[in-house]
Amino acid sequence: MESSRRPLGLTKPSVDQIIKIEAEGISQSRLQLLNPTPGVWFPITPGFLALPSSKRERSFSLQKDKECLLPMESPLQSKRDIGIDTTAVLLKHLMGSRSNYCPDGIFTILAQGPMLEPVMETALKESSGLQTAKRTPIPALILSKGTQAVMRLFLLGLRPARYCLRAFMLKALEGLHLLADLVRGHNPVGQIIALEAVPTSASLPLL
């Protein structure tokens, strides 16, 4: 009758059992069973079948709270010795953790690629919100690209280079004359940009 009335659940161990557990210590397998989530702290009270507990028993002086941090186990350790290619898994693991170190001892260099920003448009973030501002391309960049194109034409021959340079200059003069007409039509008197001094095709040397 007394055995049938035993309370269900955990029973309080004796002093001898507590001393035995203190002497043996908590093994790694017990910690793995106790804490399935790695990297989480648990206060462990020995003597209660290695179950997590934050209570302290004042009746036993040998019983103390212990805190153990379980090491992070890499998901590649189980696949490392069975001949499975773990390159894709490693990349997913690195991208998920945003780290350049894997616990297996593999170091990788994560180099950031060049940012592809449009030259004509940049985004400016302010405290009031998102504001976009357009800027004109840098003249030096355009001139460098034009110079490289002309140098390639010179490698092909002098005649194609002279023809392209003359076409470029005629198009540029046409654009300047059109710009002067637009400025006269839209700007008020006194703010007209002095574009009358633009050299004409007659004053330019023939190539």
UniProtKB/Swiss-Prot annotation:
Cellular compartment(s): Virion
What are the coiled-coil residue ranges? none
Keywords assigned: Virion
**Residue ranges of the TM segments:** none
Identify the Pfam families for this entry.
Answer: Corona_I
* Record-level GO cellular component terms: virion component
Q: What is its main location?
A: virion
Quote additional remarks: The gene encoding this protein is included within the N gene (alternative ORF).
Family designation? Belongs to the coronavirus I protein family.
Report the function annotation for this chain.
Structural protein that is not essential for the viral replication either in tissue culture or in its natural host.
Q: What is this protein called?
A: Protein I
Taxonomically, what lineage is the organism? Viruses, Riboviria, Orthornavirae, Pisuviricota, Pisoniviricetes
**Gene responsible for this protein:** N
